[in-house]
Design a protein with these regions (language model features):
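Active-site cofactor/cluster-binding pocket
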Residues: 1-226
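Ferredoxin-type iron-sulfur electron-transfer modules and their immediate structural context
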Residues: 158-159, 171-323
Length: 324
């Protein structure tokens, strides 16, 4: 089971993985891919099955042996360990390492790892992709890590076949793109294993933070966004049986999934506000501050341009939780 971000290449890589395994072994394969309505930048989940006998399962994977979480923010947004079998394997794409990773993992996740004897691997595929020149396309790196960790087919054969698919998929884009993806395959082996502390089994799961958001957001919208919409009772939709939906619910999402966020440079800013105008997620916001609002602030500002803003300051602020 693979959790990814729309347009990060996870789904495409998994389609290739199924073809590689199906074409080069006697195993039976099955794959299903689910997406949310955001498309690029949205939630994706790949459900893959491999076996030595015909697969007749007509439902999603609910008890996987292997789970890969390609977006570290998902640890706090979704129940990514749900159903992961005892003695299973978990792969995480993260910027954290070692003790820092252990510190930042939610207690719920650490508790599950310890109670179910999960083998945990991690890799900073985001950093590797940047170093190679692939931008946010972490798919090939993580696909390579999957084959190396699971051993579902011999690693040498997997590498050979992945590189064949790279030529098929990216050959028309030029030799440079092909070579970058070759490098991604080779660097997929840079994963590390996280030591799971048995003491984690006794950790208390953190309670959800209290908020003053409307009941509709907490009781309907958030469970749906957390991929738990199937668990909602019919009574949750009382009053909206006709499909009516409240407006402005997106402002409560605050997903925080951006690996990189733009930084305002006051030295080159001419206060044209075009950056805010073209930002498709309204994450770049210009502000004009009066003396009271500016008092005690420790962030850089500029003298606001325009007679109507005399004595006021200007700043552009990026909302890292809304950025994509």
């Amino acid at each position: 089971k693979f959790y990814g971000l729309g347009a990060d290449g996870t789904v495409g890589a998994n389609k290739n993985s199924v073809k590689i395994i199906g074409d080069n072994t006697n195993k039976y394969c099955q794959a299903y891919f689910s997406y949310d309505s955001k498309k690029s930048g949205g939630f994706t989940c790949s459900h893959l099955r491999f076996g030595d006998h015909p697969i007749r399962s007509t439902y999603l994977v609910t008890t996987p042996n292997f789970v890969a979480c390609h977006v570290q923010a998902y640890l706090h947004m979704y129940d990514v360990t749900r159903g992961l079998r005892k003695n299973g394997t978990f792969l995480l794409n993260t910027i954290w390492e070692g003790e820092e990773l252990a510190k930042n993992l939610p207690n719920k996740v650490k508790k599950y790892f310890a109670e179910n004897n999960i083998t945990v691997y991690y890799i900073n595929a985001t950093k590797i992709a940047q170093e190679i020149g692939l931008g946010n396309r972490t798919n090939t790196i993580l696909q390579s890590a999957f084959f190396r960790i699971t051993g579902v087919i011999p690693v040498d054969l997997a590498v050979e076949q992945m590189k064949k698919f790279i030529v098929k998929s990216y050959g028309k884009k030029g030799e440079d793109v092909v070579n970058k993806n070759y490098a991604a395959v080779d660097r997929g082996g840079e994963y590390k294993q996280l030591t799971v502390d048995p003491a984690w089994a006794s950790l208390e799961v953190e309670a959800a933070a209290a908020n003053n958001d409307p009941a509709f957001i907490n009781e309907v919208v958030r469970p749906i966004n957390a991929q738990d919409g199937d668990l909602l009772p019919v009574s949750a939709f009382k009053g909206i049986e006709d499909g009516t939906w409240h407006q402005g619910t997106a402002k409560y999402e605050k997903r925080g999934v951006a690996a990189f966020v733009p930084e305002w440079n006051p030295e080159t800013c001419i206060q044209c506000n075009k950056c805010a105008y073209v930002c498709p997620h309204a994450a770049i916001r210009p502000f004009v501050l009066d003396a009271n609002e500016q008092a005690g602030a420790n962030f850089p500002t500029l003298k606001a341009v325009g007679k109507q803003f005399d004595g006021m300051t200007f700043r552009v602020q990026v909302d890292v939780m809304d950025c994509l």
